[in-house]
Amino acid sequence: MTQELKSKLLSFFKFIFATALFIFVIFTLYRELSHINFKETFIQFGKINRLWLVLLFAGGGLSLILLSLYDIILVKALKLKMPLIRVFRVSYIINALNSIIGFGGFIGAGVRAFVYKNYTNDTKKLVQYISIILVSMLTGLSLLSILVVLRIFNASHMIDEISWVRWILYIVALFLPIFIFYTVARPVDRNNRYMGVYCTVVSCVEWMAAATVLYFAALIVDIHISFMTFVGIFVIAALSGLVSFIPGGFGAFDLVVLLGLKSLGISEEKILLALVLYRFAYYFVPVMIALILSSFEFGNTAKKYLDNSKYFIPVKDFTSFLRSYQKDILAKVPSFSLAILIFLTSIIFFINNLTIVYDGLYDGNHFAYYIALAVQTSACLLLILNVRGIYKGSRRAIIYAFISIILIASATIYTYASFLLLSWLIIIFVLLILAYQRAQVLKRPLRFKKLAVMLLLSIFILYLNHILISGTLYALDVYHIEIDTSLLRYYFWMTIVIIMLLVGVIAWLFDYKYKCPHHSIDLTLCDAIIQKYGGNYLSHLVYSGDKDCFFNENKDSFIMYRYKSNALVVLGDPIGNTKSFESLLEAFYQFAEYQGYEIIFYQISDQYMPLYHNFGNQFFKLGEEAIIDLTTFTTSGKKRRGFRATLNKFDDLNINFEIIEPPFTQDFFDELKFVSDKWLDGRSEMHFSVGQFTQTYLSKAPIGVMRDHSGKMIAFCSLMPTYSNNAISVDLIRWLPELDLPLMDGLYLHMLLWSKEKGYKAFNMGMATLSNVGQLHYSYLRERMAGRVFEHFNGLYRFQGLRRYKEKYSPNWEPRFLVYQKHYSLWESMLKVMRVIRHK
């Protein structure tokens, strides 16, 4: 049998053992808990002196400070230049984390290595010392096991009745002398020969502190037994928790304590309550304190230190990966810790709804308590819904949290007025103030998908809250109390109304105060950039007056955009110095992220797609633009006889074409308006992606007109210079609809011939929407659907007709794309673009 196979088999049997043990513990614990009278447990909890409860929680929080002795020994042994106060802070965070998700202490060992390797260049010795600390966590229990075997901590009622307990104690007791002998005989450093002994003493003190906290919890719930006997039961339970490899020994530890104390004639209700208080005091309270400490400890200070540390050596085999992520992870620890604290706060006060309900049942003024219940439930739900926003550093989410904390505090003061909980709310409020000051964005964009998820989550949470309250009332058997059930019936709707009012008012005020700032168009600067660096097929639309412009810091490039429905819709590619496009887009994305807006690019070319891709965008092909090569365009030849026939027809009718250069007279503009109004026939003008029929815009470029034999204007088209590559485009094309003449053909042909005569090389006839989109079965589903629309909905919109019409001019087809950010919906982005185009 190979070594690899042996290792796999060992891992497999370990997994089977751990799984079987876990299932056994769960079923046994369930069987024991099924006999417990939860009403009696709640009654016992109500009798507890609140001062003793505060002292228990304080003791649980302070007990973890003893574990800092491990880190002090480590720092002294390695002679690390690290402030003592920081050692205590870091150690507390590590040990609190290790107690919850320890997996035998390996999580704590990993975090220690991660933190302390930045203070030393001898990582080998660091790992060896951390290994001693990891193993010594068991040696403390080994020492206590020896005392249990010697009956100093008397647990004979368990040892004599359960044979496997005796054998576990003997095995663990033998581990201590072996460990001490090995670490003294073969020390990591001869100058620190007794490192294992020191760590064993700390481990023993640690376990005794934990036993003392549990014993104090037992005394509070009126359990009175010998301390020596209690410690004996605790040691056996701790060993069971370690063997189970379940983080914190959850389940296995509690089951052994429950069975051990039950065998002494103590009621199960008291034991359960003592265990819950112990878990809260020794695990939950330290974690909350650790989260608060981490919001200060890890952040800009740690990030700056890592940037400047000469001892920064990433872990072997993950060098490049860790170097790129370690600093970013540390920088996110404060916001992540605050988000966890907010989530836990909401859960705590959701559970505290039981207190409001219970007090309200025995109070004559039911209505006030139901209002307080609805307010607190609404505030807790609002906290949960904004946890992600707080993690992302959104000021609006933090403001929602501010309001929620104030509402929870008000409900708490009016009802049960717990000093401990009010103190906690004050701490959270202070942390939120600090988070607001360092927030990176004003708000995060809301999307239909996100709103739907939040709605479903709200319904689910409110349903769970209802189940919790109703289940507790049933367990306490309080339905015999006469209450106003109509108020309970409308409690759900009261909560919904309060949430809607809070969200609506704050969102409106926030949007009103931080409305998207208008970047005034400096046409002089735009002209200078276009004249120096050139434009594109859409750059002339900067003069339409319905868009804002965003310039880069050097003022040598800009983009045209318009704000609509929390989105910044950009028209075309950036304009200006191509070397500045990346910095321009980076600044624009930072601006949009701070404001909480989505970014959508409309009608971009494929030239800069790698640049858009770098910003995490997705692409959708809108269609293709028809670009005619004027160097090869001609009306001569057999295939072009249709063009000649059209031109000859206009000549026979004495219809003339001419180009009018600006400035234009008022009479000329009145003629244009007459034709335009007839062509529109009451329809609204389109915006954004086409020019505006205004005297200011039309005066920026020449206009081609067609007149009949009497000199009356019957058609016109406005030109769009591109200011680059000798290309030109056409914008507005309008004619008198009552005339049965191919006026659009006439305008295009005359414009093509005029452009060629003037030396232009290319002519843009515009886009054929959805043309050549999703034609392959390998294409994205959304593009294949768009392709089917192109093929089968020609009656609603002339998709195919537009392409066939432009095909007769033999153009080169260039693709145009819609660019939108990842995690955003294509259809929602398209809808916003259409709203920009259709509405002024």
UniProtKB/Swiss-Prot annotation:
Gene Ontology, cellular component aspect: plasma membrane
Membrane-topology descriptor: Multi-pass membrane protein
Location in the cell: Cell membrane
Known EC number: 2.3.2.3
Disulfide bond annotation, renumbered to this chain: none
GO molecular function, one term: phosphatidylglycerol lysyltransferase activity
Enzyme class (EC, first level): transferase
Cytoplasmic compartment segments: 1-8, 74-89, 151-161, 222-229, 292-337, 388-392, 437-450, 511-840
Record field: transmembrane: 9-29, 53-73, 90-110, 130-150, 162-182, 201-221, 230-250, 271-291, 338-358, 367-387, 393-413, 416-436, 451-471, 490-510
GO BP terms in the entry: lipid metabolic process; phospholipid homeostasis; response to antibiotic
UniProt topological domain (Extracellular) ranges: 30-52, 111-129, 183-200, 251-270, 359-366, 414-415, 472-489
Catalytic activity: L-lysyl-tRNA(Lys) + a 1,2-diacyl-sn-glycero-3-phospho-(1'-sn-glycerol) = a 1,2-diacyl-sn-glycero-3-phospho-1'-(3'-O-L-lysyl)-sn-glycerol + tRNA(Lys)
One matching Pfam family: LPG_synthase_TM
Family matches, as InterPro entries: Acyl_CoA_acyltransferase, L-PG_synthase/AglD, LPG_synthase_C, PG_lysyltransferase
The family this protein is said to belong to: Belongs to the LPG synthase family.
PANTHER family in the cross-refs: PHOSPHATIDYLGLYCEROL LYSYLTRANSFERASE
Function in brief: Catalyzes the transfer of a lysyl group from L-lysyl-tRNA(Lys) to membrane-bound phosphatidylglycerol (PG), which produces lysylphosphatidylglycerol (LPG), a major component of the bacterial membrane with a positive net charge. LPG synthesis contributes to bacterial virulence as it is involved in the resistance mechanism against cationic antimicrobial peptides (CAMP) produces by the host's immune system (defensins, cathelicidins) and by the competing microorganisms (bacteriocins).
The protein's name in its UniProt record: Phosphatidylglycerol lysyltransferase
Organism: Staphylococcus epidermidis (strain ATCC 12228 / FDA PCI 1200)
Gene: mprF
